[in-house]
Amino acid sequence: MPNKGSLSETASEMLHEAGYVGRRDPKDLYVADPENEVEFFYLRPRDIATYVGSGALDVGITGRDLLLDARMPGAHEIEALGFGASTFRFAARPGRFSTLAELDGVRVATAYPGLVDSYLDEQGIAVDLVPLDGAVESAVQLGVADAVADVVSTGTTLRQAGLEIFGPKLLESEAVLISGADEPEGLATLLRRLRGVLVARRYVMVDYDLPAKLVDAAVALAPGIESPTVSPLRDPDWVAVRVMSPRRGVNQVMDSLYGLGARAILVTEITAARL
């Protein structure tokens, strides 16, 4: 587990929602969960792929960018977790470069030398990599590099340093679950639980009453995962409908259902799911 940084809190919340014991003190580096037969080690996010790839740990949560930067052949991504999204881009002074080919032979500063080296090698571009441990946006101003390659969320930090993004994205990154070469015992359960959390975060439950003659039209508006549950009401001309709907856009779905003739439309949270 990430011990700190942007991935740590959300990863811990996700494991808690999946039914696992988490640490109570942010300084704790080890937590045992005997009920689920799992041990959690809290490590630097950058080191997690190394531990998993070497076989010291069975699975881990880290960033896709950190996994690729580690270049550990024994570690691989098995599930994207839907948080910690970012892109990996090149940046330089405005107008200095416009294409990746122009980087050939220049100095590029980055905190992800493994990732950048692999990417540029695939493109047939040779650069003089300048490895730094963070805050790479200052490298151009200080004369250490001609360009930088770094994780970008909004681009504000790069713009404040007088840099502009150029070239294609190196990578779309997010938090991922990684595993080693062998599938450890309990991985299937962990995956099923985490996928249940992802479903619970992405969907809500919608309940509404509707004239029975309008069911087909309502299902076209909100089809659900497989098929809605339709139950009879005391009034034989009306039915109760329950359906899972994507959280994003649910208010538009409610508006459409109401316009169709549905009433008593309720939306409730899903706390856990198995599909």
Model-predicted regions and their roles:
Residues E37-L57:
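Short, structured active-site "lid" loops
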Residues T50, T87-A91:
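Signature of uroporphyrinogen-III synthase
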Residues M1-V38, T62-T87, G95-L275:
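Small-molecule-sensing regulatory modules
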